[in-house]
Design a protein with these regions (language model features):
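Phosphate-binding/catalytic loop of phosphoryl-transfer enzymes
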Residues: 53, 57-60, 64-169, 271, ...
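ATP-binding/phosphotransfer module of carbohydrate and carboxylate kinases, centering on a glycine-rich
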Residues: 1-53, 112-113, 157-160, 165-278
Length: 278
């Protein structure tokens, strides 16, 4: 499986049928978020050469991915309608599974963490990724961008976003945006910046939580961003907006699983597709 966890890094991993890693590869990107077919090929080739009885290849990509492995749009990578699945299948003559990276990470939290069958997974890193499980079935939607809350505008007068709108959640609470604000700010302001971000996050979560009756929201990210300061503010705002006598309290928590959860989840997705097609 292949994932893009950081702006300057692409990772690949070969795993066994239990999702345990047997070989790991990392390459620095030539430019920030610059990924093309050759870059992905350079990661997969040594893994493929060193591994026997490969059942498939998994690609976890940031952005909107359809059921045919087409990356319809990735603002981080600057991709539109890239058929990465077909390109990799032709190169390696193996079945290829392509998922949104947040969806892949959610699979790991569901199977190896504390995630329940009705949950939302939110990742705060370069951008804001999201994925939803309902009755243990991933929600993809029509386009299919189900769970993607990063480009909901919470402040139409806010900072401009790469998608063309202003004040998107991604510009307000992503790790990249918050690190930039924290570095420019006085130490006394840092807690208030994280609390403000948590309030924005709780506001954005209130609609999907109320609409879908989700019991669990799992937030994944570095501990300098995803910590008690941010999460308690998000929880307070979510409670304020969704609390009622008939709606049990939805818990916002840090992701239980750590490490390369996207790679592991994508490997599990490859195994699922392999067994389903047998």
């Amino acid at each position: 499986s292949v994932a893009l966890p950081h702006p300057h890094l692409i990772q690949g991993e070969a795993t066994n049928l239990l999702g345990e890693p047997v070989m790991h590869v990392e390459h620095a990107l030539r430019a920030v978020n610059h990924v093309d077919f050759d870059t992905i090929n350079e990661v997969i080739t040594p893994l493929h050469a060193a591994t026997q009885n490969v059942i498939g290849i998994g690609l976890a990509m940031p952005g909107v991915v359809d059921g045919n492995g087409l990356v319809k749009r990735s603002t981080l990578l600057g991709w539109r309608n890239v058929d990465v699945r077909t390109l990799i299948e032709r190169r390696f003559s193996l079945p290829v599974t392509v998922n949104n990276d947040a969806t892949a990470a959610m699979f790991t939290e569901r199977l190896f963490g504390k995630g329940g069958p009705n949950m939302m997974f939110v990742r705060l890193r370069r951008g804001v990724g999201g994925a939803v499980l309902l009755g243990d079935v991933p929600v993809f939607g029509e386009t299919p961008a189900g769970g993607e809350i990063g480009h909901i505008s919470l402040d139409p007068q806010g900072p401009p976003c790469a998608c063309g709108k202003r004040g998107c959640l991604e510009r307000l609470v992503s790790a990249t945006s918050l690190h930039a604000r924290l570095q420019r700010s006085d130490e006394r302001m840092r807690a208030s910046i994280l609390r403000e971000a948590g309030t924005y996050l709780g506001t954005a979560l209130s609609m999907p939580v109320g609409l879908l009756d989700l019991a669990d929201v799992c937030v994944y990210g570095q501990s300098d961003i995803v910590n008690d300061t941010l999460l308690s503010a998000a929880q307070a705002q979510l409670d304020l907006l969704t609390g009622s006598s008939f709606h049990p309290r939805t818990i916002i928590r840090r992701c239980e699983c750590e490490g390369e959860i996207t790679l592991r989840g994508e490997a599990l997705s490859v195994l699922h597709d392999y067994l389903e097609n047998r």
